[in-house]
Amino acid sequence: REIEAQGAMREAAARGEIQFPWPVPGAVIATYEQTGNMGIDIAGTIGEPIKAVLDGTVQYVGQNVKGYGQFVIVRHNVRLPGKSAMPLVTVYGNTSKILVRINESVRKGQTIALMGDSDSDTGAKMRFEVRQGPPLDPMKYLEPRKEP
C-alpha cells in the first residue's frame, strides 16, 4: 500500500497536481519574495509542532544561518513538472527544537521540530520553503485552507 501511495504521489507531481498539507496552522505573515523571502513565514506559538509536509529523508539539520535560526531540510522522492531535475526539498526554519537527525526517514504529518522565536518584532514564526533547485513559491503547492 505504501509503495502504491508513493507511486501515486510521483504521478500527481508529474501532472502538476501535487499539494502539501500545511506544516503549521498559523497565518502567513510574509509571502514569497516579500522583503527577499525565498519562502513564506507562518505565525504561531513557541513550541508549536512543525510537521513534515511529505514523506522524505532529513538531508540537513543546521543553525545560525541568517533568517533561518535552527532549521531542517527534508528531501522528497518527487519532482515537480517543468522544474529542475534536482529532487524536491522542503525547508523548515526558525525552530526552537529539532526532533530529527540527518538521514532519518520522516513521514508526512510527523512532527520534525518545534516552532521558535526568531527575535523579530513579529514574534514566533517559522520559515517554510519549497525548492527544486531554485526556490519555488510554497503557496502554489500548499493545500487551500478551509474558511471557518
Language model: regions and residue ranges:
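Surface-exposed, glycine-biased beta-strand/turn segments
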Residues: 1-69, 136
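Generic beta-structure capping elements
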Residues: 31-33, 45, 77, 95, ...
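Short alpha-helix capping/helix-loop boundary micro-motifs
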Residues: 43-44, 92, 97-100
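Conserved, short, structured surface segments that act as functional micro-motifs
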Residues: 72, 102-148
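Zn2+-dependent peptidoglycan hydrolase active-site motif and core
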Residues: 54-96, 129
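Residue-level recognition of beta-strand microenvironments
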Residues: 31, 61, 95-98, 115-118
